Amino acid sequence: MQGLVENIKSSLAKALQVAIAGAVDKGQVNKLEIPEVIIEVPREKGHGDFATNLAMQLAKPAKMAPRKIAEAIIENLDLANTQVERVEIAGPGFINFYLQPSWVHGVIPMIIQEDRNYGRLELGDGQRVQVEFVSANPTGLLHMGNARGAALGDSLASILDFAGYRVSREYYINDAGNQIENFGKSLEVRYLQQLGQDIQLPEEGYHGEDIIDTVKGYINKNGRGLLDADQTTRRKTLAAYALQEKLTHIRNTLLDFGVVYDVWYSEQALHDSGAIQETLDELRQKGFIYEQENALWFKATAFGDEKDEVVVRSNGIPTYFAADIAYHKDKYKRGFDRVIDIWGADHHGHVNRMKGSMEALGHNRDNLQIILMQLVRLLRGGEVVRMSKRTGQFVTLEELVEEVGRDAARYFFVMRSPDSHLEFDLDLAKSQTNDNPVFYIQYAHARICSILRQLQEQGRPLPEIAAINPTVLKEEAELELLRKLADFPSEIAAAAEMMAPHRIARYLHDLAGLFHSFYNSHRVITENEAISEARLVLVQCVRIVLRNALGLLGLTAPEKM
């Protein structure tokens, strides 16, 4: 499906291509190659409904002033089959199109007919995309970085699905390596402490209170039998039990946050299956692995990285990077056209070597897209809430959802671009005022539901779309709402192409603002029946789009507040 705005953009682009070709044929513009014509919706109201910078794009290759090119384009422009009322040249050579006010009324039947599918696109054309996100070590609870990644990854996956991609959500379980060994040692100490032994937890151990609870749970179920086991068996047994408990807890926490994964993928399985060795052998055969100082190195410098990277340590144990290469190789083996990873910004140094390793294995490095997230700071009463995973003092995702609610948490985590540092104001997220963007947006939906409910209580049916005359919606507040509703499919396309859920968050806030402004200055039910019926259908359209957009971010659309 294509939205009203995209249809108009497409028809204007075709008309402009014909116009510039005509201008070249007449000698009004020097011969040149015609680029793709980009049509945009101007940010400023006074700059028209649509605009293009085509004349400025052509100025250099044509060796002409952009305004002169713009004049030639307009002279050759056939707008007979468009709804363009007038065309103006602005600034250095922008071409601004002003449409007949009635153009935007066409969005009303489109929204009513498509309903839950309004905004859905075929942009992805069924391409398979994997989104891997959170993938936290299963050795503790989920912190704010994990929470931001969960909201971002799940929202992005929903947007891509809505845009026509076949999406798989995946969690990579880091259940191998040094952190698991350290986890086993920490569990052993806590186990022995619980059974009366005077033993200290090393400084580098896991100090969170949660592992004490895990050990108590193990003792309640299995007793003291591990006291008689050897150290290796004791640590492995406790680690296996704790990992299962932690993973179950993580799954349930994410489920409560509205995140459901299609695949949970074990790092240990890569070791057990021989996939890591197989991948390293392939890289060696291709000439990208060499031995130095009794270790094996990947030639990351061959792919633009500053230094090569160890993949097998001198003790013969593969590094985390080696497992990561094998894991990503398997993603492509499973048939994904694109792979999207969401990482913390502290992993930025890992990006180029990861892409390089995929290129070394024969894949297009650009098909691996990595989104880096900046840090989250929690604020309460204007003061920073300190977080420390090692000391067990950080605020967990569970605690956050309990304090502010799932909807507020999810919206706040995606309302800024992931490359921006995020200050999460707990007081604002809990407030029931228009300053809280979540309250502001959801209240718009609830307000509309209240209007429609009152109509039903009065025994009046919602007007049929065929029975209304949308052209009576002439007020600027009404036209602004209609233009914003018409923009929704374009916003979906932009959010999908730019991997930017924050665009949908911003769109929601803007749409809610336009609705509240309209509602505060206009009565929906008036003495004029034609206007009343048109406005009732208009607010129903706003309700549909609010609900659709809220759903993409994993938020509810309440009918009462």
Curated annotation (Swiss-Prot):
GO terms for cellular component: cytoplasm. SMART domains: Arg_tRNA_synt_N, DALR_1. One of its GO terms (biological process) is arginyl-tRNA aminoacylation. GO terms for molecular function: arginine-tRNA ligase activity; ATP binding. It is an enzyme of class 6 (ligase). It catalyses: tRNA(Arg) + L-arginine + ATP = L-arginyl-tRNA(Arg) + AMP + diphosphate. A motif ('HIGH' region) lies at residues 136-146. Belongs to the class-I aminoacyl-tRNA synthetase family. This is Arginine--tRNA ligase. It comes from Desulforamulus reducens (strain ATCC BAA-1160 / DSM 100696 / MI-1) (Desulfotomaculum reducens).
